[in-house]
Amino acid sequence: MRNSENVLNSLAGHSQNPNYKFERLYRLLFNENLYADAYQMMSHKTGNMTKGTDGQTISGMSVKRIQSIIAKLRDESYQPHPAKRIYIPKKNGKQRPLGIPAFEDKLVQKVVQMILESIYEGSFEKCSHGFRPHRSCHTAMASIMEGFDGTRWFIEGDIKGFFDNIDHDIMIGILSERISDERFLRLIRKFLKAGYLEQWTFHHTYNGTPQGGIISPILANIYLDKLDKYIVEYISKFNKGKARKRNPEYKRIASRKDKRVRKLKAEKDEQKRRALMEEIKFHHREMQKLPATLDMDEDFRRMRYVRYADDFLISVIGSKEDCVRIKEDIKIFLLEQLKLQLSDEKTLITNGHDVAKFLGYEVTIRNTEKTSTAKGAKGLPKRSLDHKTVVRMPMEVMRKKLLEYGAMQITVKNGKEVWESTSRPVSYTHLRAHETLSDL
C-alpha cells in the first residue's frame, strides 16, 4: 500500500502539466493510509466532534470502520447521509445555512479534499486567498495594501447566495476537464446531492455545496477559479500604458528646482548659495503640494483583483465608466458561464478616497496635501503618503472588541466618550486580544 504522501505528491507533480488527465483517482480511495492521515488532520478540530446525522463523532474511529467505508466505496454502495443543517446568524440579520455531515462523510470528504487539493492547488490564481494552504484573509489584505496604491475606483463584488447556487452539472463539467474517472465524479455528485436536514425533516437539494462540508471550500475554489482566470485575462486586455504621464505643473516646478540645484553646485559665494538653497526649498515645498503624475491619464489604465471565497475587490485606475463596464462584463460572465448572480445591491462602485469594505475591513486611498514633518538626507521635507492604500478595522468593531477583551474602559467627559486603556494585559484572553489587534 503506497504511502499517502507519495500518492499526493505524485498527483501534484502530474498537475503541473495542464493537459494531463487524471484517470484512476477512485481507486486511491481504497488506500487506508489516506484515511489514517485524514483522521490525524481532523481529530484535533473541535468542530469534528459535533455529532452528524448518524449520531456519531470522529472519536469512534477504528481500522475496522475504515475498512467498512472502503468496502462500500469499492462496490459503490456508499451513500452520503443527508447533512444536518443548522443556521448561523449573519450581520445583516439573515441566517446562513451550515451543513454538518455525518462522521463517515466527513472522513471520505477529507480524503477527497486531499486528492482535489493536490490536483488543483498549483493551478489556482495568486489572487485567490480563501480556504487555501498558507493563505488567509490576512494575505488577502496584505496583497491589497501592497498592490492597490493609486486606486481611483473600487468595485466591491458579492456573488448572491453562492454556496447554495452552484450548478451541479457545471461543477462536474469543470472537474471533468481534468478528471477522466466516472466513478470519482459520481462520488462528487453524490455529495452535492446529499440533501440536508432542516428541523430534522429531509429535503432534497438541486444546487449548492454542503457549506459545513469539508470539500465545500475546494469545490468553491475550483468553481470560482473560472472567474479568477476570466478576470486575469480581462486585466491583461484592460491595462494600458507603462506609466502615468507627468503632471505638467509638477514638471515645470521640478525644472526650476533642478536649475537652481545645478547653480548651487557651481556657486562659490556663500551668500548666493544660501539664497539658492532657500529657493530650492521653496520649489520643493511647492512640488510636495502637487501629484507627480496626472490622476486621469487616458493612455494609462490599471486593474487589480483579489478574491476571498465569494467576495472580491477590484481596484481600477481609470474612469467610472470603465468600472460600470467591468461590473457588467463580470455579471454577464457569471450568469452565462457559471449560472451565478452578481448581487447588484452589494456590488458597489466606490470612489478610491471613500471607504470600500472587504472581509470586514475598511479600505481607502489616502488623500492629503500635507507634507511630512520628517526630513530626508538633504534636509528637505519628505513627500507624504499620498495615494497610498489604507486598511483599517471599523471603529465600532474595534470599540466592541476592546471592551469585550477588557482591554479598555470608556468614560464620558463633557458629553464625549474617552477611551482609556486598562492595565497591561496579562491574562490569556487579554493576550489573545493583543495578538488579534496586532495582526490587524
Q: What residue spans do the PLM features occupy?
A:
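Non-catalytic terminal/accessory segments
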Residues: M1-R432, S438
